[in-house]
């Protein structure tokens, strides 16, 4: 089977819509070609947050749920909503894996470590879930509880960890001082996902080895000291509690990792559980002690096959007949292309949790989805992406144009990470450069794919970010938004429906463009108006 006109889904990560403002990097970048696209082709303002992507009302969207819904064609109740329900009903205290972990700790007279991103951002985690497990452990009779906290500052305002941890200390006091904050680490270190193992090693030392790493005697003083040297929550240097020097993770201990979103939990969790994981062959871990075979590790959700612990509190239920899977069954040839930072998003997440591409790292002969191929473009090795706001967008486009010229693919999924990853740095001017870079790349792609190869581009985003770099309090905003996002379709011969456009309707719309029947699993309709 071959489609008449190939489709290219271009996902501009973190590219939202907002009123003109000094903090609107999208608008201030003067994306001339995008303006031309909007004047030439039909386009919509679409929902990409809250109930439209399976999240609680008014919850900002994120890259994971955005890509899931772009490929799903249905609203999928997401991890945050599920775990909020489990917490509200206290079912989390009855979860089989969690209860068995309590039993394990009591049997071994060992420590229970609660590790995760401690914030209310709701993108990777929510501290309510960790606190619920903490309270359940106390009820179960566990008294040796260690908190290995990861601070946020990226999906929240930059400096909220102080107040969050102050409240946790008060909660510990209210519970007869059961529990201690054993270590702290900014997510820059503990939640790296780009194989920067030197960062992971510092976090690992704070949790496990207690050597060659900072320490503190008062966690709140330590955070204040970090703030004074312009380290916000994301960048807090890992440290352990001197009053809990022997409270490091050790043999017979258990650790519950409370992050529910996989991508930034994979690396540190794989290091903690899998001696064959590539980090252990790196220079950063050449002299580290591995204890993963002597502990019980529980993840809230399935992260990756590289996390070798079998203990998953809420095992996944991957979606069926997502766009990529459906096109594969029909014999259509497809390509996924992105840089390292977002390769999992155009594979694992876009495929509804089905790991056909080994979380984006598979070689083409290892892909288990028929007729599917991948181009992984390395991300730049820089400390933060405002140092290179172009990221790897030009290199992605160069490779994509090579692929387009082959005339082989019926469907291409492309991710440009710039608006999101540079937006997360809080650097407004750098984010404007990032947006302008994408404007230039879109023109290159359009001129080749649409004008020379008769293709149709569907240009959209997974969530907002770069359009609000300064919040209503005139503070730097590094987090995602609830903004609407554009959907531009480069076909002058169609009209688009204006009733409740949403990114979850992109998959059926693409099938409609291909003149292919929409499967029953895709419960949402196409946005093309045939009247």
From Swiss-Prot:
It comes from Mycoplasma capricolum subsp. capricolum (strain California kid / ATCC 27343 / NCTC 10154). It is an enzyme of class 5 (isomerase). This is 2,3-bisphosphoglycerate-independent phosphoglycerate mutase. InterPro entries: Alkaline_phosphatase_core_sf (IPR017850), BPG-indep_PGM_N (IPR011258), Metalloenzyme (IPR006124), PGAM_B_sf (IPR036646), Pgm_bpd_ind (IPR005995). Mn(2+) 2 binds at residues 13, 63, 462-463. Keywords: Glycolysis, Isomerase, Manganese, Metal-binding. GO terms for biological process: glucose catabolic process; glycolytic process. Its EC number is 5.4.2.12. Pathway: Carbohydrate degradation; glycolysis; pyruvate from D-glyceraldehyde 3-phosphate: step 3/5.
